[in-house]
UniProtKB/Swiss-Prot annotation:
Protein's recorded name: Glutamate-1-semialdehyde 2,1-aminomutase
Nucleotidyltransferase keyword on record: no
Source lineage: Bacteria, Bacillati, Chloroflexota, Chloroflexia, Chloroflexales
GO biological process, one term: protoporphyrinogen IX biosynthetic process
Originating species: Roseiflexus castenholzii (strain DSM 13941 / HLO8)
Gene name per UniProt: hemL
Cofactor: pyridoxal 5'-phosphate
Length: 434
C-alpha cells in the first residue's frame, strides 16, 4: 500500500499544527505511523491522497450515519449555500431542526443550538449550576464531555489515548468542583452525594460510554442515576453528543426509557457540519439569555448550512426500519469479530448499541474505565495496521467507539469480518513464531 503522499503531507503539517493535526486522536499516536490524509468520502468508503480506498468505521467520529456525501445532505447544503452561508440572524431552518429534535426526544422541551459538543456540555453545566445554585458536578472516569475545564478531569477519548489523567491548565479550584465516580457504580455516586450534601448541581453521564471504547450501561445504572439525582436535588445531564440519533432515533434516553433534565447533542444533528445543542425542561431552558440571566452566545450557533444538513439527515433516519438495519450491522460485526478472535485463539470482547460498536483485546468483562484500560493496546495497534493494510479504516486508538452507517451493506460487513479473521490469524501466527 502506497502512503508517500500522506507521509509527505504529515511532515509538512507538523510544522503548521501542534502534532501535525487539529484534534489529537488523528495523529495515530496510539497506534504508530503516519495518519492517512483523506481526499474524499464515498458512501461507506474513504479514499486517501495516495488513492487507497478503505471501508470506514470512524465516519468522522460519528456524525455520518448516512455515510459520506449522501445525496440528500449534499443537495441540502448546496441549496442553502446558494442563498448564503451565515447571517447572524434567526432562520426558519433552526426551527425546523429544533422541531425534529423535540419530537424525537420528549425530555427536550426547548433547545439552544451551539457549534460543538464542548459548548453544549459546558453550557448545560453552567445552566445546572445556576438553576440549583450549587457548584459541584459528578462525572464518570473515562467519560468525555469535551475539552471544557470543568469536565477535563479523568476524561476519556484523546485524553485517555494520550495517557493524561488531567490536563495542565485546569486550575485546582476547577478540578475540586468536579467529582469523579467509576462508570456503572451507583454506590460510588451515592457516596459522593452523601459526602457533599446540598453541593452537587448535576450528575453528567454518557448514557452509553463511547470515549473509553464502547462500554454499555449495566441494568439499573441509568435508572439509579435518575433516582439519586431526584433524591439529592441534583439535575441529571445526559451527554448524548455521541448517542443522540445513533443508538436509536430517540437517543439513549429513548432506548433505555430514562428522562434526563438536560441533554447535550451533536455529531449526527449537524449532518457532518459543525453543530451541537443542549436542551431540556422548559423551566430550565428559559433561564438562558435573553429569556433569563444565564448567558451563552455564539457567532455561528444555528448556522444555516449545518441546520440544513442536520435536518436532511434526521428526516432520512426517521424512516421505518432504519435503526433495525443499523443495529443488525453492528451486531453482525461484533459476532463476526468474536468468532474470528476465537478461531485465532485471541481474547476479545465486543459490545454494540444501535449503530455504535466496539471491541477490546481482553478476556474480562468491560464495565468501566479500569476494566477498559486492561485491554491490550499493543495488540490493538497491530490489529489496526493489519486492518488498514486490508482496506479497513478503524479508530486509530483503542479508547474510541466505532460506527456503522446506512451505506454499510451486508457485503461490506462480511468483507470486514473476513479481513478481521485474516488479520487476527496473521497476528497470532507472528506471535507464535516469536
Amino acid at each position: 500500500m502506497k502512503t508517500y503522499r500522506s507521509e509527505s503531507l504529515f511532515a509538512e503539517a507538523r510544522s503548521l499544527f501542534p502534532g501535525g493535526v487539529n484534534s489529537p486522536v488523528r495523529a495515530f499516536r496510539a497506534v504508530g505511523g503516519a495518519p492517512r490524509f483523506i481526499a474524499r468520502g464515498e458512501g461507506a468508503f474513504l479514499v486517501d491522497v495516495d488513492g487507497n480506498r478503505y471501508i470506514d468505521y470512524v465516519l468522522s467520529w460519528g456524525p455520518l450515519i448516512l455515510g459520506h456525501a449522501h445525496p440528500n445532505v449534499v443537495a441540502a447544503i448546496a441549496e442553502q449555500a446558494a442563498h448564503g452561508t451565515s447571517f447572524g440572524a434567526p432562520t426558519e431552518l433552526e426551527s425546523e431542526l429544533a422541531r425534529l429534535i423535540t419530537q424525537a426526544m420528549p425530555s427536550v422541551e426547548m433547545v439552544r443550538f451551539v457549534s460543538s459538543g464542548t459548548e453544549a456540555a459546558m453550557s448545560a453545566l453552567r445552566l445546572a449550576r445556576a438553576a440549583t445554585r450549587r457548584d459541584k458536578v459528578i462525572k464518570f472516569a473515562g467519560c468525555y464531555h469535551g475539552h471544557f475545564d470543568g469536565f477535563l478531569v479523568q476524561a476519556g477519548s484523546g485524553v485517555a489515548t494520550l495517557g493524561l489523567p488531567d490536563s495542565p491548565g485546569v486550575t485546582a479550584a476547577t478540578a475540586a468542583s468536579t467529582l469523579t465516580a467509576p462508570y456503572n457504580d451507583l454506590d460510588a455516586v451515592e457516596s459522593l452525594l452523601k459526602a457533599n450534601p446540598g453541593e452537587v448541581a448535576a450528575i453528567a453521564v454518557e448514557p452509553v460510554a463511547g470515549n473509553m471504547g464502547l462500554v454499555l450501561p449495566q441494568p439499573g445504572f441509568l435508572e439509579g442515576l435518575r433516582r439519586l439525582a431526584d433524591e439529592h436535588g441534583a439535575l441529571l445531564i445526559f451527554d448524548e453528543v455521541m448517542t443522540g440519533f445513533r443508538v436509536g432515533y430517540g437517543g439513549a434516553q429513548g432506548k433505555y426509557g430514562i428522562t434526563p433534565d438536560l441533554t447535550c447533542l451533536g455529531k449526527v444533528i449537524g449532518g457532518g457540519l459543525p453543530a451541537a445543542a443542549y436542551g431540556g425542561r422548559r423551566d430550565l431552558m428559559e433561564l438562558i439569555a435573553p429569556a433569563g440571566p444565564v448567558y451563552q452566545a455564539g457567532t455561528l450557533s444555528g448556522n444555516p448550512l449545518a441546520m440544513a444538513a442536520g435536518a436532511a439527515t434526521l428526516r432520512a433516519i426517521r424512516a421505518p426500519g432504519v435503526f433495525e438495519q443499523l443495529e443488525r450491522a453492528a451486531a453482525m460485526l461484533c459476532s463476526g469479530f468474536e468468532h474470528a478472535a476465537a478461531e485465532a485463539d485471541i481474547a476479545l470482547r465486543t459490545a454494540y448499541a444501535g449503530s455504535m460498536w466496539g471491541f477490546f483485546f481482553t478476556d474480562e468483562p468491560v464495565v468501566d474505565y479500569v476494566s477498559a484500560k486492561k485491554s491490550d493496546t499493543q495488540r490493538y495497534a497491530q490489529f489496526f495496521h493489519a486492518m488498514l493494510e486490508r482496506g479497513i479504516y478503524l479508530a486509530p486508538a483503542q479508547f474510541e467507539a466505532s460506527f456503522v452507517s446506512l451505506a454499510h451493506s451486508d457485503a461490506l460487513i462480511q468483507e470486514t469480518i473476513a479481513a478481521a479473521a485474516d488479520a487476527l490469524r496473521s497476528i497470532q501466527n507472528a506471535a507464535r513464531k516469536g
